[in-house]
Each structure stands twice: as C-alpha cells, then as structure tokens.
Amino acid sequence: MKPLYFLVFVVAIFLSSCEQKPQSPVDAVDPFIGTGGHGHTFPGATMPFGMVQLSPDTRKDSWDGCSGYHYSDSTIMGFSHTHLSGTGVGDYGDIRLMPSTGKLQLEPGTEENTQSGYRSHFSHSSESATPGYYKVLLEDYQIQAELTTSERVGFHKYHFPQTDSAHIIIDLFEGVTSDQVLDAFIQIENDSTISGYRRTKGWANDQHLYFYASFSSPFKHFGIQHNNQNQAMKTYAQGGKIVAWVDYKTAKNTPILVKVGISAVDVAGAKNNLKAEIPHWDFELQRGNAKNSWNKALNKIKIGKSHNKEDRSIFYTALYHTMIAPNLYNDAEGRYRGHDMEIHKTDSGRHYTVFSLWDTFRALHPLFTIIERNRTAEMVRSMLDMQSKGGLLPVWELAANETQCMIGYHAVPVIADAWINGIRDFDEEKALQAMIKSANQDLHGLKWQKSLGYIPADKESESVSKTLEYAYDDWCIAIMAENLGNQQLADSFYQRAQNYKNLYDTETKFFRGRQNGGFIAPFDPAQVNFMLTEANSWQYNFFVPQDIGGHIDLMGGDEAYAAMLDSLFTGKTAITGRKQADITGLIGQYAHGNEPSHHMAYLYNYVGEAYKTQALIHQIMNELYHAAPNGLSGNEDCGQMSAWYVFSALGFYPVTPASGQYIIGVPRFDNATIELENGNTFTVEATNFSPDNKYIQQLTLNGAPYPYSFIDHETIQHGGTLRFVMGPQPDKSWASEKKHRPQRKITGDQLVATPSIKADSKTFTDSIQIRLHHPKAGAQIFYSLDGSLPTAKSQVYSDAISLTASTQIRVLAKFENKQSSAITGNFYKIPAGRTIDLATNYSPQYPAGGDIALIDRQHGNTDFRTGSWQGYQGVDLEATVDLGKRQKIKSISIGFLQDQRSWIFMPERVHFSLSVDGRNFTEIGVIPNTIPATLDGSIIKHFELDIVAHKARYVKVIAVNRKVCPPNHLGEGEPAWIFADEISIQ
C-alpha cells in the first residue's frame, strides 16, 4: 500500500502547485466590466489596438448601447466587426453576421418578439469572454457562436445543430445606430467567398469599410435581399438596403467557420489582410495567438498582491481597456484612407484612427509615453498626417473623419507630452506649425479667445470650458516652442495660457461665464448649463493644470485653495440645471464619471496636504471601480477611465501632461513592475500594506529617502524602485514643505486680466448705473462711451457711470505698464411702458435673460446653447405684451429656432390676438409652420403677420408646441422644445 499512498501524496503536491500557479494577466481580465451601467464597453474579441472589434450587437440607437451591447439586454442581433469602446456617441457596427436556423428572416425583429426577425435570446450563463475571444449560445437556434480575431480579420465559429435549414445572414444595412447608408455593394464570388462594401454617414460623416469573407464549407444556396426584395441565387447588388444569406445543411459537431477581413481601402486590401493574417482554418490556433498577443501587451505591467481580491481583475481589465483604442487603420501592406479620402501608404510604422482626445489627453496618452513609446510615435505621426491631408490636427477623429465632437485642440498636449518625454521620432517643426495652426483658427470661439482673452457666453456655447481648455493647450504650445528654441513664440503663448484669469470671479472664487462685458448672474456653481462641457462650475473650477500656482494665488493662497478643494469633495452632491447623463460617480461635487474631474484629487499635493490626496485616491478606487458589468462610474471613453485607475493603482498620476511630471498618490498593490521599452524596469513597492494603511509614512527611491510628492518621467525611464511605507494615520508633515511639493506656475510676464462690467440689465427705460471692476489692486481702468478703443488719455474709472441713452462702453485695464484686452458692453434704451406677461413658464435652463427677454430688442443666433433663446419644454408659449397705451399696429412677428437633433422644433402654428382692455381678445391671424420637423441643421424662422392697421394696447401671442418629438425621431414620444426670441410689434 505504501507505493499507492506515495502516489496520492505526489499527485496532491502537483495539484497544489497547479493551484498556486500565478494567474496570467489575460486570465484576470473580465471584458464584461463596463458593459453595464454607463460604461459603454463591448465584450467581444479584439487585438491590442486592432482594426477589428468583433462583438455582439444587442441594441440600436441607445446612449447606453453606444458600443452595440449592454449587459441588461437579453437578445442578440448578430456579430459585427467594428465597435467603439466606452464612447458617449454611437457609430460603427459594420458588416453584421448572424447564424440562424428554420424560417429565413432578414430583419432583426424586436426584443419583445424575437420570432419577428433573426435576433435570438441569450443568457449570461452561457456567455463568456476573455481578451481576443467571445462565446455565446443563441438560444432560439441552439447555435453556439465563438469569435476570435487577428488585427484586421474577424474569425467566426458557428456550432449549428443538425438541420437542413441553417443560414448565415450578412446584413450591410444595420449598424449600432440608424446611420445613413450612402452606398453599399455585395458580391457572392463563389460558393465559399463573399465580398462587399459599406459606406455610411453617421457620427463619422463619410465612413468606408470593405470586407472579404471566406467560408470553411461551400454553401448550398444563397441569395440577396435588395431594397426589401428577395432574390435567390442573386450574386451582386449595389446601393440601398442590402442583406444577403447563405444556406447550409449542417451536421452536429461540424461547425461552420467564417473569416472576414476588413479594410478602409478596398476589397483587395480586405482580401490581402485575411490572407496575410489568418491563412489557415485553425480557430483554436488563432484564439491562442490572440491570447498570446494580449498576454505580451498586458505583461508590460506586472502586479503583486492587493487587499481586495477583485483588484487584480479590475487592474488588468483597466489595462486591457487602455489598449483597445486608438485603432489600427492601415492594411497589411501599408495602405490607408487619409483625411482627404484618398488612398495613401505609410512611410513607416502604422496609421491609426479613433482619437477621443478630449478624454484621452489626460491619462491614456501619458500612459502610452511610458508603456507604448514606439506606438506613441506612430500615433503622433498619424495625427500630423491628418493635419497635412485634412487641414487641422484631430479633435475627435473617427474613420478618417473629423467629427468636431467635444472641445479644445487636444492633439496638442498629446504631441507635446510625447516630445517632452523623449519621444522624438516625428518632425518636430512640422508638429509645432500644426499646433499653431489649430490655435490660430477663428473656429469654435477662438476668434474671441484671441481678441478678448476669453469667449463670451453669448457668442459661443461651452464658453467657460473652451476658454479654460484652450489656455492649457496654448501652454503646451509654449512649452514645445520654448524647447525648440523659439522663445518669442513661447512668450506669446504663455500669455494666452493665462487667459483663464479673465473668467475668474474674485467674489465667488469660481470661473464664470461672461457676456456684455460682465459676469452672468444669477450664479449657481452646481448648475449644469451650456457654458460648460458636460459639467457644472464646480467640476471645471480646478482646470488650470498649466498654472496651478497662479490659480492658488488668485484664490488667496494655499489655505484658501485647500479649503475650496475641501468644499468640492465634502459638499452636497445635488446638481441643478439641465440633465447631464455624464455627471456620475459623485463625491461631493467631484464627478469621477466624467473627465474634467480626473486630476482634482491630486491637487492637494500642490498645497502641502498630500495626505488628503492619499485618502481620496484610496476612496475613489474603493468606491468607483468594481469587478462587475456596472463596475465603471461613467463612460470608459476609449481608455481614459481605465487609464486613471492604472496610473492611480501604480501610485502616481499626470496632473499636467507635457510637464514631464507625475503627482504621487497611493499604490493599490504591494508591488508593481513596469517593463520599459528601453530594457529598464521601474518597480513600485508598498510595505506595511493593508486595507487600513492608506497613508504614506515614508517614501524612498532606490533606497534613499524621497521626500517629494511628485516624480519625473525621466526618473521612471531610468528604472529603479519607488518604495512606499504605509500607515493607518496621516503624516501631515510629509511633503508639506514647499520645496517638496510639485510646482506648476507660469513665471514669465503676467497677464493683466480684463476688467468686468456690472449692471442690472443690458436694457433700460430711463437710466442705468454701470460699475467697472478689476481683480488686481492698483490696476487703472480706462473707458470710452463712444465705441472707440480706450487709451491712456481716456477717462479713468472712479465711480458708477450713469447712462441715459443707448451706449456702447469699451473698457480696458493697465497695470505696471501692461494693459488688458479691451472689452465691450452694449446697453439699450427701450421704450418705456412696454411690459410682458407670460402665462406659461419657460425652462429655468433657458431663460434668455428672464421675462423681458422676448421684448428686449435682442435677437438670438443659430446656436441655442449661447443662452439667447427662451426655451419651453412640452408646453405652449403664451405671452401678452402691454404696449402701455393704445397704439396703431401694422405687423407682429416672433422668431423661433429649430434644431431637431437637440429635440427643438418649430411650433405647429402661432396665433396672434389683440385687445384694448387686456381681457377681451380678438384673434387676427394664425401663421402655420412650414419647416419640416425632419429638416436638419439650425434654422431660424420668423412667424410674421402683416395686418390692416388696428389700434390696440395688448398683443397676445400663442405658439403651439407639438408637445412630443415626432415618430421615428430619436426622442420619439419625449417632450419637445420650442425656442423663442424677440416679439416685434410695429
């Protein structure tokens, strides 16, 4: 018996050792994290930065389904080859394949009744995913579908039951959204090959995608539905709606495999991609190749133990999500579609698409400068190529199209950050000129930013956010110019980088919107409005990464700045104003679910209170990241949400990209090692590591004391060990001395901020008092009342100015031989006695200046977000104007704006009535609407009634709201808006 006992002992030891074998990074990844809630990720198969994202489609035209998939869904419509990861706008879902059995169905059908189409129920219990692989059972057909990929090829494996009626549907019409199919064609080349093309207009205005599909077994029958007409054995169709199918007689345990190569260039490119990357039919081999590729990519950072068993999965899933986009865009032989829509070939390296730069400049691209340096150079060259062929650096680039989504010119910090961090494999002078060109446009409020030093809220939407973000981008240009030896250029952009000061209100200590020379009142920092980008004033109040020291000075010093940060994180979470789905993950008014807040927890280091940063980072990682489908607090945004976690788990974060500096936080693991591309390793260790020990007691670098709460990029690249000694109580003295804190301050010539104008209104009937203010003690304010530019010989402001006639006042300030930009205020005298009574309430989000807005003789422009239109949601507008006395009336008109993409429509009709006593009204005319609700763009229409002269004192205007958005509109059935402006009475 002894040999038997020995054998059992050996087997037990072997099994124990197997159980203790370290889990590979791929095995730790959970692609379902972020597929629920508002994460907007997809679970399907892709390669690191691959062209193909082969994933199931479960819903369409849904904000929470921007990736095509949401974990709460229970049906699948098919598997398409392109998807976006974590975006807030949907697109893609190109070239859908769907296996089915039984009656041939060529429409997706409905979720409520899957029998109405080809979609199928599925269950998460029979669904699994890992990087590069996805599997699910289509319950309605009992088909198990498996997916894997190479970089440019999707590989399908369908396990059909035994049946004479197996189908594979190829749908070129359906996508993630109801994008417009501009053109399409399909060619059934033989009994095992299909090729085609899909050209669409969606978020990307003109997207081209070609495919070449090869089937492992010849299909016995096939056909094409062209514009809803089925034709069996048809081999070609072009234009309109195209859905094809192939039929099989299948045996159990004999799967059908399909390889689909894609290309933005042509069918030949798609075919070549397929042959170059998957020339075989071994699905498991390719699945293994994908796993190996992901393991190699994820092993760039090796982590140790954490005090939370979920943390390993959260970390490696986050790292996985950072490597999904940007996406490869050139074919295997180097050809790609440029921003001029022509076909080009890469000179070296690879060409990329999907640049979500408003999000990713903050942490994703800085992460790449550490772990993806060669790829970063390729991405920078891709951006410069886009500029050379499309005119400007990308803002939000998608499939060779500039979407103009979001704000700023944030390719600039990505390029500057790469260069500052030693990535120089691109034309630096060409890069600098491209940066300057973006900054010197007149687009998107830049005209005003350049002339005034800020963007007025009535001239451009998102004026506060744009002013602040342009200032940071301009600092990046200054840094680049200075390092390239162009100091004069650098100085001019350092001045522009201080434009944030023009929006700073010393009374409230917030950045505020301005119009007519003054700050807009009333002011509520918790209010979400169109002066800000997906945020309220709290969530933009600390976006001065280029001049944190200057911002601290404005607030009154370290203590005042720290107190304001305390208020941010400890205040009430209530949000006022318009609804904004992106504002999630709240800690006080800090919103981790959206990007503007991401750096804020690290700002305490700048005022010597690093222990507060440590506590907050610990809290955010504990509360706002989980190993669950709804484990992200907001949109993944092409890797930014996850890049925050990767950096923070390592113990540092890039508060100011392009500074070459990272701010120390608190690590999540007892050790983590970064494998650098130069052959060095940088290790972060944490001793006394436990859930309660969240505070730094000591920091050492390569064994020597390191008292600083920041670390340089160059130090990381040299390799070494950064060791944290942790404890349960804060060491408030650690890194509290100024010499140990990070310093980020513009030290050259200081900008003289613009003065501000204070007045109760911009209209008056008798007189109005105007006051001028400048935040700098000792600054002189000069003004003119005749519209001329003030000079040193102009009047010097000393006390309130009384106006009794319509006047344009121009104002500037001088301090220490420097002067500010000149600002302008226009004040209008309107006839006395005219008043307005509103029987219906306008939305508090869109007051346009209050009740008087409809008779203030000011007219709105084509952008409703500038605040000059009065908005009514789901209700009619009923207004009665009292002229003060009985007058002869010849015409009445009222202006309306339509922007159907924002659910704003023309009224169905406008009724006009007159009265002499304000009680008894006579309707004198009705003007019907003639603008179709489907007409796109921003449209202004004046509903005008010319009448035979009537005498009346009261004029009533009723604009009939359609109440709900029309059928087939994205907001169908939801409350509709009407936006009104000036009622003119002649």
Predicted segment positions?
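C-terminal motif of bacterial Sec signal peptides marking the signal peptidase cleavage site
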Residues: 15-17
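Accessory carbohydrate-recognition regions in carbohydrate-active enzymes
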Residues: 21-365, 369-413, 419-468, 476, ...
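Short proline/glycine-enriched turn/loop motifs at strand-loop junctions of beta-rich domains
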Residues: 162-164, 774-779, 886-889, 907
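Beta-strand signatures of extracellular beta-sandwich domains
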Residues: 698-700, 780-784, 911-913
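Extracellular Ig-like/FN3 beta-sandwich strand-entry sites
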Residues: 719, 804-808, 950-952
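Short acidic/polar inter-strand loop motif in beta-rich domains
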Residues: 730-733, 816-819, 961-968
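Short, compositionally stereotyped local motifs that mark structural "simplifiers"
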Residues: 743-877
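Aromatic, loop-rich ligand-recognition surfaces of beta-strand-rich domains
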Residues: 861-927, 939-986
